Amino acid sequence: MVIAFIPVRGGSKSIPLKNIKPFCGKPLVCWNIEALEQCKEVDEIIVATDSDKIEETVVSQAYKKTKVYHRLAENACDTASTESVMLEYIRYTQLAEDDIFMLVQATSPLTETLHFTEALDMYSKGEYDSILTCVRNYRFFWNEDGTSMNYDYENRPRRQNFSGMLMENGAFYINKVGNILESGNRLSGHIG
């Protein structure tokens, strides 16, 4: 079973209820839900929230695979980690250890069905214990002490010869439930 899990708090301090603010004509969280609804590999989509307004927004769309999970208040506060609500849900629902758990961030609305499909296909090959999404960054980075992090400044590479670095973009993560329970983390083992 493949579960897509979208944690969305109502109490964001920077932008209250940001996950249901209109973004290009629809609530922000709906972009990922709709992409996941079209992904044939995903069996169930869980929106974990503490907000009645977010729940109303999601339920009003009448999605077929999507359900709302009411997360505990202690796992919806500013100091709670995403892992805390993931573990809460996994333990509450007693998911099987071999179920595939895909953490999806509502704040990455440009993620398309194809991205989910390709990543789940990659994961199904068994080469990796967990997977994360990245973008390739072609910038040169420095430490505050004046040392370069990812290149030799005395032999500065031409852009065409610089492979850059992969930067985690946080769009989504894939792991097995058993790995998450064992590590307490969205990523574990051999990461792809």
Q: Could you say what each language-model-derived stretch is?
A:
Residues D78-E88, E97, S108-G192:
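Conserved core of the sugar-phosphate nucleotidyltransferase
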Residues E44-T49, T133-C134:
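Short internal beta-strands
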